[in-house]
């Protein structure tokens, strides 16, 4: 891939970009290599829409991939900006947007560089299945916090660093059932909820909720659960601006 990435952001791994770029041909196939993501998408959308009125909202999708969540958010009336560092995936997302007629502002851009542009703040930011794939996830959380308007919400989904997660998300999904290619996930990069909570606090955000999310491959179905030992969703809110004093 182009060395232009070095001019954009250092907070990426080339191997991760190459890995997900290889999924382009079947990204929008609900029975293809991204089948689990298709099952998770309605759960993620419902989790967000219950906490943010999406119609007319400004929403940022960080690490948008081929645009599954981006389009779903836009269908709910949100004005969506979606960023990813993989040109191949942004191309897939744009082409599918042309086919579906759904308007999303797709960009090959790092969140640090979007922050440098000082855009209007966002009502909501989604960072789904992304933090476990970058060298410095805390920096992503911090950049997200700076891009939220007061009262705006950050939504994160990731994988807990537990034995259960290793057995199911790595051994089971990649080696036994083979839902995902081998090497998709690295156990050492999984994130415990307490670690995420610390990054959110450091960024000035208040953690509102943590909910488990479970994918059932035998049914190809996903659902929320009280158990956060494997996949989980989190919502954090930016503090309201202090009232002006006379």
Curated annotation (Swiss-Prot):
It comes from Xylella fastidiosa (strain 9a5c). It is an enzyme of class 2 (transferase). It holds the Pfam family Methyltransf_23. It comes from the Bacteria. GO terms for molecular function: 2-polyprenyl-6-hydroxyphenol methylase activity; 3-demethylubiquinol 3-O-methyltransferase activity; polyprenyldihydroxybenzoate methyltransferase activity. This is Ubiquinone biosynthesis O-methyltransferase. Belongs to the methyltransferase superfamily. UbiG/COQ3 family. It catalyses: a 3-demethylubiquinol + S-adenosyl-L-methionine = a ubiquinol + S-adenosyl-L-homocysteine + H(+); a 3-(all-trans-polyprenyl)benzene-1,2-diol + S-adenosyl-L-methionine = a 2-methoxy-6-(all-trans-polyprenyl)phenol + S-adenosyl-L-homocysteine + H(+). Transmembrane segments: none annotated. GO terms for biological process: methylation. Its EC number is 2.1.1.222, 2.1.1.64. The keyword Transferase applies. O-methyltransferase that catalyzes the 2 O-methylation steps in the ubiquinone biosynthetic pathway. The lineage of its organism: Bacteria, Pseudomonadati, Pseudomonadota, Gammaproteobacteria, Lysobacterales. S-adenosyl-L-methionine binds at residues 44, 63, 84, 128. Pathway: Cofactor biosynthesis; ubiquinone biosynthesis. Keywords: Methyltransferase, S-adenosyl-L-methionine, Transferase, Ubiquinone biosynthesis.
């Amino acid at each position: 891939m182009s060395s232009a990435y070095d001019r954009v952001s250092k907070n990426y791994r080339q191997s991760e970009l190459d890995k997900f770029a290889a999924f382009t041909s079947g990204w929008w196939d609900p029975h293809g290599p991204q089948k689990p993501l298709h099952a998770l998408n309605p759960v993620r959308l419902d989790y967000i829409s219950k906490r943010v009125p999406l119609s007319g909202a400004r929403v940022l999708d960080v690490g948008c991939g081929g645009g599954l969540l981006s389009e779903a958010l836009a269908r709910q009336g949100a004005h969506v900006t979606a960023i990813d560092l993989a040109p191949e995936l942004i191309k897939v997302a744009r082409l599918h947007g042309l086919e579906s007629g759904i308007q999303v502002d797709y960009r090959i851009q790092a969140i640090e560089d979007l922050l440098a542009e000082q855009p209007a703040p966002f009502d909501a930011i989604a960072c789904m299945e992304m933090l476990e794939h970058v060298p410095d996830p805390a920096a992503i959380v911090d950049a997200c916090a700076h891009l939220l308007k007061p009262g705006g919400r950050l939504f994160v989904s990731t994988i807990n660093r537990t034995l259960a997660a290793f057995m199911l998300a790595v051994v089971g999904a990649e080696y036994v059932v083979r839902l995902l290619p081998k090497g998709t996930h690295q156990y050492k990069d999984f994130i415990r909820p307490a670690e995420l909570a610390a990054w959110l606090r450091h960024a000035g955000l208040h953690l509102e909720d943590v909910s488990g999310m479970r994918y059932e491959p035998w049914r190809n179905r996903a659902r929320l659960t009280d158990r956060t030992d494997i996949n989980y969703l989190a919502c954090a809110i930016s503090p309201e601006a202090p009232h002006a004093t006379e």
